[in-house]
């Protein structure tokens, strides 16, 4: 790789890290607002319960990846920090939080799918508090099974301060290749395919059947939200696949790309919902003290919020 390419890569990662840290308070405040408003319509719906937990996973992933991978790459932490017996913990943590995000994305897509295709059963039968709690337990417990195999081996880390990236390799080369290739296929192919099919079905239904006050605006909001989520996960999956297919010593460039895309993904949920939904923006600014509280009209905004 040329020196110019290295300079561009490290600059992009520095910029994405700085922007993510600036956006972190916004994400935290977003979760706080949804939590405070959780018993007030329309925020007392399963959709916003799922949003809270997805945003928590996003925040934890951003903090974890920054402190355990980026800062050592930037020279903030000494590399000896990763030469102890617990070297598997950073990798396991990333796998756990990444799949917690993935399940959150899938469950939100399923929620939107049932809301559009089966609105009556969606409200009255399927999305009960018990079902929502069960899905949230699945979101946080199932990733444990994805990261469990990692504890059967050790990892070695090599931090490149020139590229701002990190290379890690399991002591068992065969395990390293098989495990990360399998995870890359799950994240990059299976999850993206599921989300794409669900949102594709939503778009078709909204375009041909659903009647709302502003159908064009609703379709645009749905399309933009789904597009950002899908593109982020698609790009993340491509980086994961390329990294898994590349020998560890040569995989640094894909790891750098992965961390940049991950920064975008971790900040997309809160920012997209704030950008595309006026009631959420009003609640956000009200808690900042910009506007006084006048309540949220569920009559005017419920259908729009339910469609995001």
From Swiss-Prot:
Provide a GO CC annotation, any one.
Answer: membrane
Q: Does the keyword Membrane apply?
A: yes
List the Gene3D superfamilies: Rhodopsin 7-helix transmembrane proteins
Enumerate the UniProt keywords alphabetically.
Membrane, Transmembrane, Transmembrane helix
Checking CDD domains in the record gives: 7tm_classA_rhodopsin-like
Q: Where are the transmembrane segments?
A: 15-35, 46-68, 88-108, 135-155, 184-204, 222-242, 256-276
**Pfam hit, one:** 7TM_GPCR_Srv
Its placement in the membrane is given as: Multi-pass membrane protein
Q: Which cysteines are joined by disulfide bonds?
A: none
Q: Where in the cell is it found?
A: Membrane
InterPro entries in the cross-refs: 7TM_GPCR_serpentine_rcpt_Srv, GPCR_Rhodpsn_7TM, Nematode_SR-like
Q: What is its main location?
A: membrane
- Is Transcription regulation a UniProt keyword of this protein? no
Query: What family does the database annotate?
Result: Belongs to the nematode receptor-like protein srv family.
Q: What is this protein called?
A: Serpentine receptor class V-1
Q: Which organism is it from?
A: Caenorhabditis elegans
Lineage here is: Eukaryota, Metazoa, Ecdysozoa, Nematoda, Chromadorea
